[in-house]
Regions:
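Mixed-charge interfacial surface used for oligomerization/domain docking
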Residues: 3, 11-19, 24-25, 30-32, ...
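Acidic/glycine-enriched edge-of-secondary-structure segments
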Residues: 53-69, 201-216
Length: 298
């Protein structure tokens, strides 16, 4: 196996078990809770997911921060010293400045120190477990003996084939994060509107349709995955949830019965969870290429 370290970040929502299975590492983003800085921890060591989502439900002020330069250095430098090349699969540049920080502030300095090594900082144009799925597929290619250039090129050529469909329980947290206007959130909550989000071909998250009520929103998620999923590509399917385990189980049962898919349920972590709030749920797969653009009316 080639000496390649595959990194992603806190936005990828890959569990401890999955990261160990595929030998994937990650760099930490951060959250700030009522002024107190904390790591955006996918292992849930410093706080449990129920505690995190409880903070949001209590109305505590939570915001997110991107990966810092020291965090990159502390993780990348030891790998380079050991002779590894690095592929960093990053959260969409439309949602985080982490990939830009890596490309402009971290990579040049480290390549001066380690001129024989290679570092790829790849904008996944995605987030949450669809970003994580890209890292998994990269790890499979590494295990198959592909070179760092081959793995990185495959990711660049195929990253738009990773799809997600997501919905939220309330529009309040999207409003707090500045994603929608206050009036839309107010009237949407009153009407029971559940927006269905995807990531477009430029890495923007946008609403493709609106469902009335929880049952209809779950149906839209399932239908979206059915349309996008391509079983012949042989990738995992994930269901992400933030205090929505019962709905995640419902989707899992439907996917097993209707598509014979054994989907894995995972927590939606602190980065996406802060923006979307308790009750967020999403499905993720490798499938058809994303060709939509925000505002294209399709």
């Amino acid at each position: 196996m080639a000496k390649i370290k595959i990194f992603t970040d806190s936005c990828s929502d890959l569990s401890t078990e999955v990261r160990k299975q595929y030998d994937i590492e990650y760099v930490h983003m951060g959250i700030v809770v009522d002024g107190e800085e904390k790591r955006a921890d996918l292992d849930w060591v410093d706080y449990k997911p129920e505690e995190f989502y409880g903070w949001l439900k209590e109305g505590r002020h939570v915001k997110t921060t991107q990966v810092s330069v020291p965090e990159f250095m502390d993780n990348f430098r030891p790998a380079l010293k050991e002779g590894y090349d690095i592929i960093y699969i990053a959260c969409s540049s439309k949602l985080s400045g982490s990939v830009s920080t890596c490309e402009t502030l971290v990579k040049p300095q480290l390549l001066e120190e380690f001129p024989d090594r290679k570092i790829y900082a790849i904008d996944s144009l995605n987030a949450s477990a669809s970003e994580g799925l890209i890292a998994i597929e990269a790890a499979k290619l590494r295990a198959a003996g592909k070179s760092v250039d081959q793995v990185a090129n495959w990711v660049e050529e195929n990253k738009l084939c990773f799809n997600f469909f997501a919905t939220v329980d309330t529009l309040t947290y999207l409003k707090n994060a500045g994603r929608i206007k206050g009036a839309k959130a107010f009237f949407g909550n009153i009407m029971g509107v559940k927006p269905i989000f995807i990531s477009d071909a430029l890495g923007n998250n946008f609403v493709i349709k609106k469902a009335k009520g929880t049952k209809n929103s779950l149906e839209e998620l399932i239908n979206g995955l059915k349309e996008a999923y391509m079983q012949e590509k042989g990738a995992e399917v994930f269901i992400g949830q933030g205090l929505a385990q019962d709905r995640a189980e419902t989707i899992k049962e439907r996917l097993k019965a209707e598509l014979n898919i054994e989907a894995k349920i995972t927590w939606i972590g602190p980065i996406v969870g802060t923006t979307c709030g308790p009750g967020v749920i999403a499905v993720y797969c490798l499938g058809k290429e994303v060709t939509r653009f925000e505002g294209d009316g399709k």
